[in-house]
Regions:
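Conserved, compact domain cores that house catalytic/ligand-binding motifs in diverse enzymes
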Residues: 147-253, 258-259
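Divalent metal-coordination and catalytic microenvironments
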Residues: 68, 158, 197, 202, ...
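Solvent-exposed loop/turn segments at secondary-structure junctions
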Residues: 159-163, 203-207, 256-260, 307-311, ...
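Short acidic, glycine-rich surface-loop motifs adjacent to enzyme active sites
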Residues: 200-204, 335-356
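Extended active-site neighborhood of metal-dependent phosphoesterases/phosphodiesterases
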Residues: 130, 135, 216-339, 361-376, ...
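Active-site-proximal beta-strand elements of phosphoester/diester hydrolases
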Residues: 150-173, 299-312, 344-348, 408-415
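Acidic, histidine-bearing metal-coordination/catalytic regions of metal-dependent phosphoesterases
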Residues: 8-13, 17-174, 182, 186-194, ...
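Bacterial Sec-dependent N-terminal signal peptides
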Residues: 1-9
């Protein structure tokens, strides 16, 4: 694995305002890092012709993509020059979509980048936006090869600030204890410095921006009519996530908050498919069930299963199990093609997660029954041997649950920004039988302020341990909280050994 992260450098045009122009020259990256932290910038006023652009690197089933979204009026895409072996050539980004009404006043572009690419530069003359994020215009590329894997994977989930139409509103302006996602993203980038960031879904929570208390920071996302528009996508995800997007590529799966509206057009689901989905759409349409996406990060394979519409009411229903059985069959087929590689399933709703447990054996509440039933109905009646882990969110807690059987452990990371839930008493979870067929929980570690109490804000890290994965939970400051757990390497008894 190279010791220097490969960097994409975004070089802005010379017509920038003075403060932006001062930052136009790309800063040099220190060894092992992704460059200095970009300075804070303010977005241009709404309607500015020069507009504002956001760029990031995303892993997809079709490979690594550089994505670029701009509100400038040119409707053009920049070109990227990068090195590949001994050659260095420019490559134009492909325009995916043009502005579409008030919800999507953006031009969206993307470019496929080979795994071995390095030193990519956005051509100076091709950038039309007045402001580009990250402000230092540097974007990370994968620092693994086809024969290696990421050394450090950060897992986040349920990150948006909850502003519902009715009911309690999260304190979006308080980034310490109210809505700490901006702090979590900054500290994960600075302290953990991951090689890859996995987001397990739920990005867009501002259902009624008129009720939020951080309107001044988010022009264009302040009224009910503006919900799920581009400026709200920036407010809930791109602006707070900027330090992470400047540090590592991302792999994304969809959450239930990115659902379709009744018209299957626009809304949060339309925003997901326009900007963040594995395959982008230009028509504003929303699809209820996305295809499974198998994403390669060297010898680590991440398979995204869209569970955003699995049991919408969280009632324990198994309706539509067949839809998900087909997707888990696809997971198994992909895993069996590369039996020597590790596979992680990442899906928003957990397959096996305990929300509450009492003293009696039958007193246990777990999620998500329809996904569990779907796994049992696959051709294997289980997940493949080399599916080592399931990564999920949805429940606003951190929990590691294992069974010490062929069933992979369930890691739930729904604690990265949204209002926290109460968790179970882990002592009462151990030994409870859940799933199909019923299997006893071998180990349950839930990060809580007290047993059975409120969860703790933070994120998870999976570090390559030389043939295994070492799991840690990090609080909002980036500090490790609790034990370090090493994932076993045997297919018959998948579990964590914690110390």
């Amino acid at each position: 694995v190279p010791t220097l992260r490969r960097i994409v450098v975004l070089t802005a045009v010379g017509v920038l305002a003075t403060g932006v122009a001062a930052a136009a020259a790309p800063a040099s990256a220190p060894a092992g890092g992704a460059g200095p932290r970009p300075p804070a910038t303010s977005p241009p006023p709404p309607g500015t012709a020069g507009g504002e652009a956001w760029a990031w690197t995303q892993l997809t089933a079709a490979g690594t993509r550089i994505r670029y979204v701009s509100t400038d009026t040119s409707q053009t895409c920049p070109a990227v020059r990068y090195s590949l072996g001994t050659t260095r050539n420019p490559y134009p980004m492909t325009r995916v979509s043009t502005p579409m009404g008030s919800q999507f006043p953006t031009t969206v572009c993307e470019l496929a980048v080979p795994l071995a690419a390095s030193n990519a530069v956005l051509e100076q003359s091709s950038v039309q936006a007045a402001v580009v994020h990250p402000a230092n215009r540097q974007l990370p590329l994968p620092d693994w090869t086809s024969a290696t894997r990421p050394r450090k994977v950060a897992v986040i989930g349920d990150t948006g600030c909850e502003v519902p139409v009715a009911g309690p509103v999260q304190n979006c302006a308080d980034h310490q204890t109210g809505w700490p996602f901006p702090r979590i993203a900054a500290n994960a980038a600075a302290v953990t410095r991951p090689d890859l960031v996995v987001h397990v879904g739920d990005y867009l929570y501002r259902e009624d921006p008129a009720r939020e208390n951080d309107k001044a920071a988010n022009p264009g996302c302040t009224t009910t009519a503006e919900r799920a528009g581009w400026d709200c996508v920036v407010a809930d995800f791109f602006r707070p996530a900027e330090p992470l997007l400047a540090t590592a590529p991302v792999a994304l799966t969809r959450g239930n908050h990115e659902d379709c509206n009744a018209a299957q057009q626009g809304g949060a689901g339309g925003a997901w498919f326009r900007y963040l989905a594995d395959v982008l759409r230009s028509d504003g349409r929303c699809i209820t069930y996305s295809p499974t996406a198998s994403i390669r990060a060297g010898t680590l394979n991440l398979v995204s299963v869209d569970s955003s519409f699995a049991d919408p009411g969280d009632t324990g229903s198994t309706a539509q199990a067949g839809v998900f059985t087909r997707r888990f069959d696809a997971v198994n087929q992909a895993a069996q093609q590369h039996p020597a590689n590790d596979y992680f399933v990442f899906t928003h709703k957990p397959v096996w997660m305990v929300k509450a447990a009492g003293t009696l054996p039958q007193n246990v509440e777990w999620a998500t029954h329809v996904l569990d039933a779907a796994v049992d109905a696959t051709g294997l009646h289980r997940l493949a041997d080399n599916v080592r882990l399931v990564l999920s969110g949805h429940i606003h807690l951190y929990q590691m649950l294992d069974f010490n059987t062929g069933r992979p452990p369930q890691l739930t990371v729904g604690s990265s920004g949204g209002p926290l839930d109460n968790g179970p008493d882990d002592a009462k979870v151990v030994g409870k039988e859940i799933g199909t067929p019923p299997q006893a929980v071998h180990q349950s570690i839930t990060q809580e302020q007290a047993p059975g109490g409120r969860g703790v804000f933070g994120y998870a890290v999976l570090a390559d341990g030389g043939g295994t994965w070492n799991l840690t939970f990090h609080d909002a400051s980036g500090a490790v909280r609790g034990q370090t757990c090493a994932l076993s390497t045997t297919a018959a008894s998948k579990s964590f050994v914690c110390h």
